[in-house]
Amino acid sequence: MATTPRPLPGDLLPGDLPPGSATNDDWWRDAVVYQVYPRSFADTDGDGMGDLPGVRDRLGYLSELGVDALWLSPFYTSPQADAGYDVADYRDVDPMFGTLADFDALVADAHALGIRIIVDLVPNHSSDRHPWFQEALRGERRDRYVFRDAPNDWESIFGGPAWTRTEDGQWYLHLFAPEQPDLNWENPEVRAEFRDILRFWLDRGVDGFRVDVAHGMIKADGLPDVGPKEGRQVELLGDERVPYFDQDGVHDIYREWRPILDSYPGGRMAVAEAWVASPERLARYVQPDELHQAFSFDFMMADYHAKSFRAVIEKSLAEAELVGAPTTWVLSNHDKPRHVTRHGGLARARAATLLMLALPGSAYLYNGEELGLPEVLDLPDELRQDPAFKRSGESRDGCRVPLPWTAEPGCGWREPWLPIPEDWRGLSAEAQQDDPGSTLNLYRAALRLRKEHPALGGGTLRWLEAPTLERREDVLALERSPGLAVVLNTGEEPVSLAELGLAGEVLLSSGPQPDPGAVAPDTTIWLQLTPQTP
């Protein structure tokens, strides 16, 4: 199935990025990456689905926002049983989203603006419409997938059994939807195919890959039963007891991929979506000869409380440092409720974001969070498209509602694939553009300062100590050297800067500061410290 990509006429490669962009091979260590969920981002042909030309049209908006790179969720040829995470052709663009020429133009224009492109890679499973699986259903070459004569007790992440019976009586494994059969990564042909897929997109100029279900692919020998347990197996996600995730053999795959990435110029990279049992297990994915980044989902799932945030930050930084990798922070994505809703309101979400953007390492944003969008909780059941909803009653559609661009009815969309709430007109990019206190302009200011301030981005942090902090477990204070303090107040009462032993200029605050000498509740500030005299 190997193919030769056609030459790209005059496209900018990463080594050709313009002055002022992140041009070194380690650009990813402190990059801010913006996740684009293409079907929900921007629509240019009026069919209600976002597309690649829509992303291209909004590159100016993304450049003004200040992001370093875009991560594009799947746009490949797919029957869309799981919103593109069921891939039928890994080397082409689904007509819903455009063409390969549209993709090439997007890459070229993004590179011209100094924005890098990361694409989703889905290696654990393909679509059941993939030519390989169609061959398998005919009884040919079933060794590319996982077939057996009788199922074990494994359950699908989406609910129900992880096995479906074929017409001839065998069963095939699908850890997600039945339309997403698991590939057999013990087969050398599967491994060779994905090495070729990597090269195909690298040759087209992509700067990296987000590896979907990076903890998957390899299963325990013999496919043993999970055994008796309480509740659904999905509740064990990230537990070392699960015989189909986080197996040691998956690291052999990444050690095969790393030399391919390193053989291309410009610092090509890969980031793991790995749900594992601990930061120690996560650090194994970012060893020097494997992947470059792995999302800190512990940070995303932490309770909104200073003590919880600090515990996760300390552990994550310590484990990543042992293998020389940066920590990769994230608060929202296409699989989890938006953090405005998860943390209990916009003020808290803004405070958590300003904390995240002050931490050493890389940060990933999810499209629409810069507008302060909440989770949509009242979508009609008949409009939901998430396969998990059909099998378990749980749905991710609420975080996938299309973005509001204008304050007009429809928010810039004509009959979007999911309805946009009427009150989102006030949250639209147009409505927030000229409002200095808007969430959009908070993100712009934070990303600008992150680029300009020598203390932000890479480096280390130091926890600040004060008697007040011993009494106030709902307050977190840290210093980024040189001279920047970050204070988060998750409590219900203001905290005095003087009591923390801090003095200086507030460069940025996530919310109003009625008392300039204190940090208000549910607020994070970035404070330029006044130099102390000897």
Features from the language model and the residues they span:
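Active-site and adjacent substrate-binding regions of carbohydrate-active enzymes
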Residues: 1-504, 509-534
